[in-house]
Amino acid sequence: MEILNELISTYKDHPKEGIDFKDVLEIVQHPIVFKELILKMASSKIVSNAEALISIDARGFIFGSAISFQVSKPMIFARKPGKLPGELIKKKYTLEYGENSLSIQKKSLNNFYSFAIIDDLLATGGTVNCVSNILKDNGKKITGLLTVVELIELEGRSKFDFPVESWLKCK
């Protein structure tokens, strides 16, 4: 999908100096490209081998929701602090430009064993690693990670013991 490269905008020094932020939102403004991407992502073995999908706050929700709809599988939300009600499983993580934490509703994991993780971008792997640790700590299996963009120089995929599929690899 060569066109993806044209639809990813780069913002220098965002959210802080030294970070080149890759923005995937323009993909959604091109429905034919978005649909083609979702169909490709949805056909991945990572998705077919999972009982449920787990998407990461917030841009991962865009792709995760569309894939969930396409394959009729449940989607679980990994959210930033203060966004989810109920009993939560929380974990802190470090990312390229700071520290944060993610929460998942405990009851949302109860009925499923295997999960595909979906996000918009893989950089250092901190966010995905946080989600994978929550899942593993709760006895769950990860079928893999699907991401639109992968920043290959940051070698995020090297942190994982599960498959990673990305549709656009950038420096």
Curated annotation (Swiss-Prot):
GO terms for biological process: adenine salvage; AMP salvage; purine ribonucleoside salvage. It comes from the Bacteria. Pathway: Purine metabolism; AMP biosynthesis via salvage pathway; AMP from adenine: step 1/1. It catalyses: AMP + diphosphate = 5-phospho-alpha-D-ribose 1-diphosphate + adenine. The keyword Transmembrane helix does not apply. GO terms for molecular function: adenine binding; adenine phosphoribosyltransferase activity; AMP binding. GO terms for cellular component: cytoplasm. It is an enzyme of class 2 (transferase). InterPro entries: Ade_phspho_trans (IPR005764), PRibTrfase_dom (IPR000836), PRTase-like (IPR029057), UPRTase/APRTase (IPR050054). Belongs to the purine/pyrimidine phosphoribosyltransferase family. This is Adenine phosphoribosyltransferase. It comes from Prochlorococcus marinus subsp. pastoris (strain CCMP1986 / NIES-2087 / MED4). The gene is apt.
